[in-house]
Amino acid sequence: MASRLLDHLTAGFTASLVWDAFDNYHDHEQYWTIYGLIRTGLRAFTPKKRYYAQKQVFRFVRPGFVRLGVICDAPDLRVLAFSSQDRQQVTLVGINTGLAPLHLNVQLIGFPIELRQKQAAYYRTSETENCHCIGRLPVNGGNWPFTGIDAQIPPACIFTLTTLG
C-alpha cells in the first residue's frame, strides 16, 4: 500500500485518501474487507503494518510541501523528497525493497544554511518496527565524502528522514 502511495506521488498526484480505514463488513456485498489500515476486533481496533507504512508519509509530508527532484542510483532504493515552500523544512520518504542494507547520503543542494545546521529525525517501519524514531542525524555530516544526511537503511523497510520538529 505504501508503494502505491509513492507511485501516485511520483505520478504527480497531490493528495491521497484511504477508502477503508478499518476492516469492515459490507452489507450490500455480504463480505468483510480486510484492506483497511486498522484491524477490527470485538472490542479493540489495532493498527496494521500498512498503517505505520502510510504514517511515514502522512505524518511528515505536510500540506503545502512541494516535491523535489532526487537522484538515486540504487535500484532497490526508492526515494521521494519534499520541502516546505520556503525551503526551511525537508522530508525524504523511501523504501528499500532489496534484501541487503544500503548506505544513503543525502546532499541538500541550494537550501538555506539554517536548514543545513539542523538535524533530521530518522523514522523506520520494518518487520519489527512501527514508525519508530531511530534517532537524529546531522543534516550536514562531517564524514568526507559523505557530507549530507548519512543513514544506513536496512532491507525491506520504509523510512523517513525529516527536519520537522
Question: What does each of the following model-derived ranges do?
Answer:
Residues S3-L6, L77-A81, V93, T147-I149:
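Generic recognition of flexible, low-complexity loop/linker segments
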Residues P101-G135:
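Beta-strand-rich binding/interaction modules
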